């Protein structure tokens, strides 16, 4: 057989046959179901994920780090997750930490140890970590604190970061000085040199920064061997999951729409895209494989830290919501600010994410109120504005236009189906649904999995 080149070969490559007609969009493969926060975080995403994870084969995280907090209650045991996908509880499910997540390895193992004591078993057989995920170092956390102190000194205010090193790690990623899990898995001497160079860069910017590099490298060498069996090429892992046998794949978003680096109340936001685009970039999957996108919202609104909050109630109502709702941050332990449900932000979150349905949580917290208000529009100088303001100073000046509803004044915590809810609570839910133009699929009336009323 001749392996030489011929004129025929040339013709076949330079004049390929035309592709007939328009190429169809490749919609093949399993669809990925996505759960996202629709407010400022702490909406109860973990509970919705937990419900769906019972039937899922894979649950993934696509962005954020251990600055997020999910609480899941199973058989009266309360599990707290920060980096681990909450699907890790399900023994038949693989949990995947994607390339868009930033991983603090000491934090990851501390979280695993805590949840093991509560009964989590066999996690190492069902956890996969992307080799392209970036590493959060202890010195990133120290820098996070120094930056907050600097902001406070210069501007008289800070961002209210969790000081978990998330922002500095994403900044390193963008400036191309970051290190990834694949670097830790490769030559450790080369990895060590790059870590030392990064520390020197930071110390030139922050002369007071003290770092015990050798101690951190020693710990990282130990962690490297512990995670080595869990590390995979995330792109190929997700491709096989989507294009292999039929699987149910679920993605749990961290943080929320109004904390998104692009679409949130900047600069009081997180450092990643926590809207639907972050799912594609944080896992390495095509948009065509995104299926249902579920938005999660409380029946009222909360926010941790500083930043604009148009429907905030700095009064007895806000205090009652805070107390009844046990509104304390899972990650920070800070009290959450509380206010009425804001449909302007919910509609805005839907515009970005294209929610196919909503989960409305913590309806039972409103049970004791005589009247309940819902923010339906913003006004500036008495005139309605047709959009959610990007500029923070404008947002802080808006007046909120409210619709007022009579309270139902009865306990909803035992409700397990739509018909069990009082008529006034049903009216409230239908109003929210109609205003934002998205069906409400679940209504939460308590902490446990059983307290989620499924509507359809």
Curated annotation (Swiss-Prot):
Cofactor(s) the protein requires to work: Mg(2+)
Sites of Phosphoserine modification: 130
GO biological process: 'de novo' AMP biosynthetic process; IMP metabolic process; muscle cell cellular homeostasis; skeletal muscle fiber development
Residues given in the record as Mg(2+) binding sites: 42, 69
PROSITE patterns from the UniProt entry: ADENYLOSUCCIN_SYN_1 (PS01266), ADENYLOSUCCIN_SYN_2 (PS00513)
Phenotype upon loss of function: Morpholino knockdown of the protein in embryos results in severe disruption of muscle fibers.
Binding partners and assembly: Homodimer.
Family affiliation: Belongs to the adenylosuccinate synthetase family.
Protein name: Adenylosuccinate synthetase isozyme 1
Source organism (scientific name): Danio rerio (Zebrafish)
Gene: adss1
């Amino acid at each position: 057989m001749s392996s030489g080149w011929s004129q025929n070969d040339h013709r076949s490559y330079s004049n390929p046959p035309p592709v007939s007609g328009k190429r169809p969009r490749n919609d093949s493969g399993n669809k990925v179901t996505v759960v996202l926060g629709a407010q400022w975080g702490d909406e109860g995403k973990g509970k919705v994920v937990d419900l769906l994870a019972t039937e899922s084969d894979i649950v993934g995280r696509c962005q954020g780090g251990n600055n997020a907090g999910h609480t899941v209650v199973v058989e009266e045991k309360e599990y707290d997750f920060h980096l681990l996908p909450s699907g890790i509880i399900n023994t038949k499910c693989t949990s995947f930490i994607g390339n868009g997540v930033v991983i603090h390895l000491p934090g990851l193992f501390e979280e695993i140890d805590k949840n093991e004591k509560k009964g989590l078993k066999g996690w190492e057989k069902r956890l996969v970590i992307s080799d392209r995920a970036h590493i959060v170092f202890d010195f990133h956390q120290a820098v996070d604190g120094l930056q907050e102190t600097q902001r406070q000194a210069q501007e008289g205010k800070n961002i209210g970061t969790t000081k978990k090193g998330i922002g500095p790690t994403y900044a390193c990623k963008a400036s191309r000085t970051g290190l990834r899990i694949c670097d830790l898995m490769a030559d450790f001497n080369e990895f060590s040199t790059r870590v030392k160079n990064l520390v020197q860069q930071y110390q030139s910017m922050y002369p007071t920064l003290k770092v015990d590099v050798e101690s951190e490298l020693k710990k990282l060498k130990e962690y490297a061997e512990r995670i080595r069996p869990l590390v995979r090429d995330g792109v190929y892992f997700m491709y096989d999951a989507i294009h292999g046998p039929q699987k149910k794949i679920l993605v749990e978003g961290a943080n929320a729409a109004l904390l998104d680096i692009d679409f949130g109340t900047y600069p009081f936001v997180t450092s990643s895209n926590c809207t639907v685009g972050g799912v594609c970039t944080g896992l390495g999957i095509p948009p065509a494989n995104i299926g249902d996108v579920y938005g999660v919202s409380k029946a009222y609104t909360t926010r941790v830290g500083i930043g604009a909050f148009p429907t905030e109630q700095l009064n007895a109502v806000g205090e009652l919501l805070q107390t009844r709702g046990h509104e304390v941050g899972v990650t920070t332990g800070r009290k959450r600010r509380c206010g009425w449900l804001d449909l302007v932000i919910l509609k805005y979150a839907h515009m970005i994410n294209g929610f196919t349905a909503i989960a409305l949580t913590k309806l039972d917290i409103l049970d004791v109120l005589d009247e309940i208000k819902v923010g339906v529009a913003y006004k500036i100088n008495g005139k309605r504005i047709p959009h959610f303001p990007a500029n923070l100073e404008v947002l802080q000046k808006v007046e909120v236009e409210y619709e007022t509803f009579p309270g139902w004044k009865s306990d909803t915590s035992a409700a397990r189906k739509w018909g069990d809810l009082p008529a006034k609570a049903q009216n409230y839910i239908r109003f929210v649904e109609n205003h934002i133009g998205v069906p409400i699929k679940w209504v939460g009336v308590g902490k446990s999995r059983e307290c989620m009323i499924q509507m359809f």
